[in-house]
Amino acid sequence: MIIELADGADERLADYTRLTDVALRRRLETQRGLYMAESSKVITRAVAAGHAPRSFLMAPRHLDEMRPVIASAAGCGGSDDGGEVPVFVAPEEVLESITGFHLHRGALAAMNRPELAGVPELLASVRAGAGARRVAILEDLVDHTNVGAAFRSAAALGIDAVLVTPRCADPLYRRSVRVSMGTVF
């Protein structure tokens, strides 16, 4: 459903205003938490990977270009107005008051974190000949920008899967996702 906003203090925007990236990761842990997808390209890639949006937030000028992406998103029921998924539309100055920065990419989406396959599942698929043949491992890489760049490079090199060690920076952190241009999905 498209919801036009004139005020950034709307309670329905809590995913965008009240949570740090760390809190997004931990929030609703039973539902796998949240992450932010920023820019139409990244949102398009997240939706294409089957990630389900909680909501969209964008400037009016981006609504028409995002309608096909919204319609194809899980939970939107094929409706380009989002169906049951809120599509918040607000003027640029309201978006800036919500996010704290000029949203020059024009669109954000609060996405549910997907449940990822573990190492045993990945290895079993490799043994069965159906899984990843080229695997990269990011070990204890702590800078989010570097993690995003590593995923982008892995995609360019044709890497099939990337394993991330527990002490590695979160690949779904907003900056990692943005630097990767959505290749983390």
PLM segments and residue spans:
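Boundary-proximal intrinsically disordered activation/regulatory segments immediately upstream
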Residues: 1-71, 168-169
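Short, conserved catalytic or adaptor-binding loops enriched in Gly and charged residues
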Residues: 28, 69-82, 179-183
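Short coil/turn connectors at secondary-structure junctions
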Residues: 31, 52, 83-85, 105, ...
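RNA substrate-binding interface of SAM-dependent RNA methyltransferases
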Residues: 48, 112-114, 120-185
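Short, conserved acidic/polar surface loops in the N-terminal third of protein domains
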Residues: 66-70, 97-102, 118-123
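A glycine-rich helix N-cap at a beta->alpha junction
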Residues: 72-100
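Glycine-rich phosphate-binding loops that contact phosphosugars or nucleotide phosphates
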Residues: 109
